[in-house]
């Protein structure tokens, strides 16, 4: 019975590892494509009219890439839940971490999906008219959507909850001796760097707010690396953290 239970635990752990790796890759690949074809994420802080024009020129390929960016990270949802289930024996905060992590992923997905289902309509209205009133209405609608779904939901709440999840899980996995301290600190440090990118969001409403331009790119890249390494460890380790 013990052997069967152990085998089930190890199988669940390997599944979790593959979900982490596939989810991280699913985020990284469309992110990289968007940085090449749409100057993402720098484009987010350009003038609304410029963003709408560039988006329209990107056509269906750009819309599809944004959809992939929103959806291909979905394997992280069950991965977070499986990690949380395994971590509950080691921390009373595991359920809270899972709730925050899953919520963060969902609100980021909602924010990203605006580029697939709402922005195409606004860019079409903006580009295909010479009426200043229609252009102004499109810009106003886009600006409101951009600030709410993008800055508030996706970039602030989504990233903040993800950062908190990463720090909590790093501490729990270190406590469980699942991986070495350097891996735990990689998760924590990448999260703290990622947290500094929140300054860019405040700068959208507080002119002159100090911003470290590299924080978002560096923090998110280190976070993806941490996810992938954690996934590899879960696949390769012969012992779990039960």
Positions of PLM-derived features:
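Hydrophobic, aromatic-enriched alpha-helical segments typical of multi-pass transmembrane helices
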Residues: 7-242
């Amino acid at each position: 019975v013990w052997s069967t239970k152990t085998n089930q635990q190890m199988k669940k752990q390997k599944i979790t590892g593959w979900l982490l790796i596939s989810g991280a890759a699913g985020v990284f690949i469309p992110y990289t494509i968007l940085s090449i074809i749409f100057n993402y994420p720098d484009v987010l802080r350009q003038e609304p009219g410029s963003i709408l024009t560039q988006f329209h020129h990107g056509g269906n390929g750009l819309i599809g890439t944004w959809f992939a960016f929103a959806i291909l990270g979905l394997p992280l949802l069950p991965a977070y839940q499986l990690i949380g289930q395994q971590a509950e024996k080691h921390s009373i905060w595991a359920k809270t971490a899972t709730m925050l992590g899953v919520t963060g992923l969902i609100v980021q997905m909602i924010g990203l999906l605006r580029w697939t289902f709402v922005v195409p309509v606004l860019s079409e209205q903006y580009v295909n008219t010479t009426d200043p009133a229609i252009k102004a209405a499109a810009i106003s609608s886009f600006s409101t959507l951009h600030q709410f779904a993008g800055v508030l939901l996706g970039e602030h709440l989504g990233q903040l909850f993800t950062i908190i999840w990463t720090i909590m899980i790093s501490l729990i996995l270190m406590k469980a001796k699942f991986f070495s301290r350097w891996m735990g600190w990689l998760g924590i440090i990448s999260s703290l760097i990622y947290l500094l990118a929140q300054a860019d969001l405040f700068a959208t409403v507080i002119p002159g707010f100090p911003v470290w331009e590299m924080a978002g790119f560096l923090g998110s890249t280190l976070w993806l690396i941490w996810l992938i390494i954690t996934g590899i460890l879960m696949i390769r380790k012969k012992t779990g953290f039960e």
